[in-house]
Each structure stands twice: as C-alpha cells, then as structure tokens.
Amino acid sequence: MRMNQQDTHKENLEFNKLQKKLRRNVGNAITEYNMIEESDVVMACISGGKDSFAMLDILLGLQKSAPINFKVIAVNLDQKQPGFPEHILPNYFESLGIPYYIVDKDTYSVVREKIPEGKTTCGLCSRLRRGTLYSFAEKIGATKIALGHHMDDMVETMFLNMFYGSRLKSMPPKLRSDDQRNVVIRPLTYCREKDLIAYAEYREYPIIPCNLCGSQENLQRQNIKAMLIDWDTQTPGRVESIFKSTQNISPSQLADRNIFDFENLPLDRTGKRAEYEFTEAEVSSSNINIDESMFIDVTNI
C-alpha cells in the first residue's frame, strides 16, 4: 500500500508538471500571436482525438485565469463515418457543462464517391470538413476557429511541402481564410506531440480512432514522421530547433525572388567604410620571382 501511495504521489507530481508546461506553452502561443482577444467566441473543433481533447481542456483551464473574457464553444463534425460512436462526445461535453454543437454532415459518402479505392481520402476529407466548419463558425458567431495541430504537425507539414511539393511552407499559428471571413488559430503551436500523448493518458480521454473511415495516413507523411522521431531520438531538441527556424526567416539568405529583390542590389560606397576585423594583410603572387614591393599594407586603406 505504501508503495502504491508513493507511486500515486509521484504520478500526480509528474502530471502537474506536464499540465503546467502545456498550459504555459499554450498561453505563450496565444499571447505572442494574439490568438484570442477580448470578447472572442472561440469555436474549439473537437474530433475525438488526443490533440483536440487536450486543446479543449487547456483552453477551458486558461479561460478561468485569463485577464480577458472569451467564450469557448465545443464543436464536433459528425461526418457519418461507419462505426462512429455518436454518444461519446455529447456525453463528454455534458460532463464538462460547456456549450457545444454536433454538426451532422455526410462527407464520408462524398469522399468515397470521389476517391478511388485504395487511395488516401484525407486530403478531400479535410477540405470538406474545413468548408463545413467555416460556414458553421459564421452561423454561431464564432470569431476564432481553434484547431488542435501541434508543433510536430507543423514541422511534418513543412518537410512534406519541401520534399514533395518544392515549397518552403508549413502551418501558421494563426491564419485568416482566403475569403477573409474566418480566423483559424492553433493554440498547441508550442506543444510537442509526445507531451500531448502523455497528457491524454493521464486524463484518460474517451479517444475516438481517427481511421474509422478505413483510410490510412499517407506513406509520405508516415516517412516524415518516422524521420523526425529518429532525429528526436538521436538529437533531442532538434524538432524544436527546426520549428524555431520558421520564426527566424532571412529572405536575403534564401532564393525566392518574390520576397527579396535579388535583381536590384546596387553598390553603395558612400560614407566612411567601417573598419574590418584585421589589422594588416599581404598580397602575394604565384610568380616564381616575387617582387616584394608588390606586397601591400592595407592597414590604413
């Protein structure tokens, strides 16, 4: 019994530490990207996966202590996938005592009709889901749409675009839709997937499998995910470093002519030149007979 009590105490300490870390990361992301503002109505999109459950959990926790007032509404899109347990999310939302909506939209049939057998359906499914959620956000007056993508998702997406699309592009922490009618936020931007997995295990969320439709994660993303896991094992902190690089862009050190004017780089030698970091230099020649008078002291040039 004593060992059990010790184990429980240790587990509680680990959970509290992890919870504080995730809340701090989410709070920092919200603050730094101005994700949530006074009087915002945040539509938290809940799929039933670990990430969206954790996002909702943390948002509700921050809502109680935030210096601003904002509303959180949980929304699940029931896409009519076979075997989807329709009772789980309503029961969960009811247990939390929060406002929620279940949106019924049979995108599953549309995807099955359009995508050939054996091909991944995730791309079309995602687009149909996004369009439905955008429309519903306007209907309920939501000013922000919160999605559960985390740091690993963003880094994976960047490499997918680099390796298979020849684009240096990822997922932004905050995004305005093309028609400018909706703003999407990703509060888990600074959170690692491994922390969310551990958090979900502690919280014992009623996780709903994401592959009820029968579609498997595409091979390209699987390869990228495996690569990042290997890197993270060999060099802890590498994923964080890669993500931070997306926050420190130097357009003049890349090659995109659309974001930096490489064609017009005129010399400007007006004014006094700043001193270089050396005091003297010698210039020599490959000639066999070297004329020492050709050596140049550039100290005062």
From Swiss-Prot:
EC class of the enzyme, as a word: transferase
Catalytic activity entry: cytidine(32) in tRNA + S-sulfanyl-L-cysteinyl-[cysteine desulfurase] + AH2 + ATP = 2-thiocytidine(32) in tRNA + L-cysteinyl-[cysteine desulfurase] + A + AMP + diphosphate + H(+)
Protein's UniProt keywords contain Metal-binding: yes
Cofactor binding note from Swiss-Prot or TrEMBL: Binds 1 [4Fe-4S] cluster per subunit. The cluster is chelated by three Cys residues, the fourth Fe has a free coordination site that may bind a sulfur atom transferred from the persulfide of IscS.
GO terms, molecular function: 4 iron, 4 sulfur cluster binding; ATP binding; magnesium ion binding; sulfurtransferase activity; tRNA binding
Short motif PP-loop motif, span: 47-52
Keywords: 4Fe-4S, ATP-binding, Cytoplasm, Iron, Iron-sulfur, Magnesium, Metal-binding, Nucleotide-binding, RNA-binding, Transferase, tRNA processing, tRNA-binding
An example Gene Ontology biological process: tRNA thio-modification
Cofactor(s) it depends on: Mg(2+); [4Fe-4S] cluster
Binding site for [4Fe-4S] cluster: C122, C125, C213
EC number: 2.8.1.-
NCBIfam families: PRK10696.1
Family stated for the protein in its record: Belongs to the TtcA family.
Misc remark: The thiolation reaction likely consists of two steps: a first activation step by ATP to form an adenylated intermediate of the target base of tRNA, and a second nucleophilic substitution step of the sulfur (S) atom supplied by the hydrosulfide attached to the Fe-S cluster.
Job description of the protein: Catalyzes the ATP-dependent 2-thiolation of cytidine in position 32 of tRNA, to form 2-thiocytidine (s(2)C32). The sulfur atoms are provided by the cysteine/cysteine desulfurase (IscS) system.
Self-association and partners: Homodimer.
Name by which UniProt lists this protein: tRNA-cytidine(32) 2-sulfurtransferase
Annotated source species: Photobacterium profundum (strain SS9)
